[in-house]
Amino acid sequence: AYKDDGAIRFKVPSDRTIEFKDFVRGDMSFETSDVEDFVILRSDNTPTYHLASTVDDIDYGITIIARGEDILSSTPKHILIMEALDAAIPNFCHLPLLFGPDGKKLSKRHGDTSVEAFRQKGILNDAMFNYLCLLGWSPGDDIELFDSDFAISKFDLNKVLPNSATFDEKKLLWLNGQYIRSTSPNKFEEDSLQNIENQLSRELFHEEKDRLLKIFPSVQERIETMNDLFGQVQFLIDEPFIVDKEDWESVTVSYTHLTLPTK
């Protein structure tokens, strides 16, 4: 390493071939002649990603580094740092990136990309987990619906596809609908009543619950998200009778001044 304008650069040897096996992409090799000397410590003494992430992996004893394929070109640098620190070289796995419908890397410009945002849109946790598993991997035998236990038992990094996957929200909605339909009637009723009460910000009346329970079986077969529920059943819910304060006062004043008839 050497100092350059206040920063510290790692001196890359010019006559080496860095080789490693990638679980997704197979045998990889990079010529160090194609890798420039890189900064590991900025002029303000803060470490760069290359140094910080590598030291962190060493410190935690990471044996498999799984990350996006956009970091693949940085792997030779990280291996050189590990060798310089006399650390064991872990296994690597560079996963395909997710793309939007326009063929560009998935980002906020495509709309919602956080799990919490999809949860608020009515996507079930199990459905989201299931769908994300299918982006670049498959358990085989054309199986699309499975729980986390099944996925864990079947998952193998060697079977992850190297090709980038497209995040298809329509497919996610379809999958979410399948999970809703596979929910037990009792669980669906419980979740639905809670969902409606959250929308109303009040508890349902017994009469309303009775009406809703009768229609839930047919609604369960139609909706794709729990957010679709309220629009399907709103006509069965009693609207609260709201009286303007001034009107209420005028009515109460009138009744308090009524004279009871006498014999």
Question: For each predicted feature, which ranges?
Answer:
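Generic alpha-helical segment signature
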Residues: A165, S254-Y255
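Post-transcriptional modification and biogenesis factors for structured RNAs
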Residues: S218, V251-S254
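Charged catalytic carboxylate motif
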Residues: K77, A127, T256
